[in-house]
């Protein structure tokens, strides 16, 4: 039988980071020694107190349907955290839970964009691999905002103005940034706020790495700027801050009218989250010491890993101020990012993500996670150094 599929879905490319991980697993299964730096996941387990809270909830029978918005104690806890830590003026009624930050982004874009109308969504380039496919799946048109390695990918009004049009509906931004590790300064946030107001745009601010910052850096939430707050949908979750990737716990914080409308999609596509997972998340909000310990461990690994990369001929890597990614530009006999990633995997046994997966701004760049065991990171540096020197000398 010939199956017919929705073109907006069938045209979506596979996730490059997941594809690389699968290839690395297959190589390992075939007996090859591969170090994986491609995963976007903390290498810590969920804090004990959060796990215990989830187990206790299951034992007490908290395994039934619950509110589609999410249990109120969790939404109140998230709102309190956003007020105190992110400067966002909100209440529990501004919070909507979702099965992961990725779905929170999809259902928000799906709610705001009219398919078939040619409505455009601006995304940072380079930017996370799933933004453009999500926009396309929702019926929108993704448009890249080109940022440069030379300027360390800092966002500018000029870059935004180059691509905005009368069809632009939404700007998706992500700080701290995956893949570059760049953070958003207060001046840059103010610039974006003015841009959104001048063009009457909404902002979707993905802040899933907001707790992972270094060297006293601050990554500002646009929703903390009062004059633009009613234009901002903030997306966050528990995957990165509390090492809860498998629990699938995300949320949006937005004006009540937007939350109410997105909830309609929630009700008809996923009903509600698991109550025991949400009770674990409620406890995770109290795990700030555990989060701080994770971040300090990432900082230590960042310091030696980035220094090691910059010691390799032909490799340049800015020191990331946030996330747990190193974004390196590699000059290797004219190879593009896919060819570089393939070479490192085949010749060095090191799995990385090619920069082209993050947009044209990723040409000749690769993303590597340093949320990996220190011994593996040091061995990966040794292998990459040897493989790159074979060509660069």
Language-model segment annotations:
Residues 2-5, 13-15, 20-34, 41-57, ...:
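PLP-dependent class I/II
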Residues 9:
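Substrate/cofactor-recognition hotspot
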Residues 38-41, 56-75:
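A glycine-/small-polar-enriched, mobile loop at the entrance of the PLP active site in fold-type I
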